[in-house]
Amino acid sequence: MSWQAYVDEHLMCEIDGHHLTAAAILGHDGSVWAQSSSFPQFKSEEITNIMNDFNEPGSLAPTGLYLGSTKYMVIQGEPGAVIRGKKGSGGVTVKKTNQALIFGIYEEPMTPGQCNMVVERLGDYLIEQGM
């Protein structure tokens, strides 16, 4: 299965009638493996800062998580594994695998829990596959 198919079929899928706003799979170096057409244009330092937070959990909390120049308030995640951000009625979930970062961005009516489930389920599967 292509990386784009993972984005299209496993991240941008329908959950209780709702979809993520945007999704992507990136390498740890910030290279885009696949993304939805709606995924924001990001800066390389934004991905570097996200990777730094996985290595030093809590480092993003004071400044916030920036993605595509949008600032998300960092909320409870799983240190070294999942970073979650909130902005207004939406947010972002980032799951780190051995080689990739899985991103899901949502807006209401999708819930944070639905976004977490979609992103983390794919991330856990890729980890099981050695990715």
From Swiss-Prot:
Its localization reads: Cytoplasm, Cytoskeleton
Source superkingdom: Eukaryota
Gene3D superfamilies assigned to the protein according to its UniProt record, in alphabetical order: Dynein light chain 2a, cytoplasmic
Q: Which PROSITE patterns match?
A: PROFILIN
Molecular function (GO) terms for this protein are: actin monomer binding
Q: Which UniProt keywords apply?
A: Actin-binding, Allergen, Cytoplasm, Cytoskeleton, Disulfide bond, Phosphoprotein
Motif Involved in PIP2 interaction: where? Answer: 81-97
Q: Show the InterPro entries listed in the entry.
A: PFN (IPR048278), PFN_euk (IPR005455), PFN_sf (IPR036140), Profilin_CS (IPR027310)
Is the Cell membrane keyword given for this protein? Answer: no
Where it mainly occurs, coarsely classed, is cytoplasm
Quote the Pfam families the UniProt record gives. Answer: Profilin
Residues recorded with modification Phosphothreonine: 111
Note whether Phosphoprotein occurs among the keywords: yes
Give disulfide pairs as residue numbers: 13-115
- List cellular component terms (GO): cell cortex; cytoskeleton
Regarding protein family, the annotation reads: Belongs to the profilin family.
Listed PANTHER family? PROFILIN (PTHR11604), PROFILIN-2 (PTHR11604:SF49)
Q: How does it assemble?
A: Occurs in many kinds of cells as a complex with monomeric actin in a 1:1 ratio.
Main function: Binds to actin and affects the structure of the cytoskeleton. At high concentrations, profilin prevents the polymerization of actin, whereas it enhances it at low concentrations.
- Name this polypeptide is given: Profilin
Species name for this entry? Phoenix dactylifera
